[in-house]
Amino acid sequence: MFLRFADRPSDSPYIERVWRARSNGGGPFVSVAACHLELVVTRLADSAMVTVRGPETKASIIECPPDGQWAAIRFRLGVHMPSLPTGLLLDHHDVHQPVSADGTFELHGLRWPLPDLENAERYVDQLARCGVIAREQVVEAAIRGDMQPLSIRSVQRRFRRTTGLTHGLFRQIERARHATSLLRDGASILDTVHETGYFDQAHLTRSFKVLIGETPASVIRQDTQLSFLYKSGRPAPG
């Protein structure tokens, strides 16, 4: 595999995880479906840029440049940018900003230094204080399965406005990613079907072809380079 990843969780109310990646060579990889908003720094031999990356509702093939480095802050679901609707960023409609000679980039009409992942929590707190990011409590409660003093339709509307996804699609993506992690960790296909609540192997396979871009068997064999996956635990109820 030509992409190598490292990551850590965060106790910040804004950050779900921070991760780094490095490519030892170039080539195509499968970018699997994902729910979270990310702030990604890309460093190549002749350039650097910062990307606000939105959710991905389906798997796709991406060409990876050789000898690249990436550092990213993955925000918790419910964290959004009020000036940049998440729904406009879906499926690689990302916003890219060049890094200037002084090592800064523009976001929300302000100049920012590149994030230091060792101090990502402090960096993100500053983003929040300046109004660049905000939390939507309704989305956070919906993920936990909490009762809310709102109609189901109101919750669904605010969930989609904040995340760019329906609550149902969010659950499908998280389930498929969790199933992928189980298979890569050595679980059998039948055990994975049972653990993640798919009806049967055919149901799992159909979901994987859309959201993961591979069959369960090819995931087990690790035939193809996949985008960043990590052990996320059991998806939230809903």
Write out the residue ranges for each language-model feature.
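Alpha-helical bundle regulatory/interaction domains
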Residues: M1-I152, T162-T166, R184, S188-F199, ...
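Short hydrophobic clusters on alpha-helical segments that form packing/core surfaces
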Residues: F159, T163, A179-T180, F208, ...
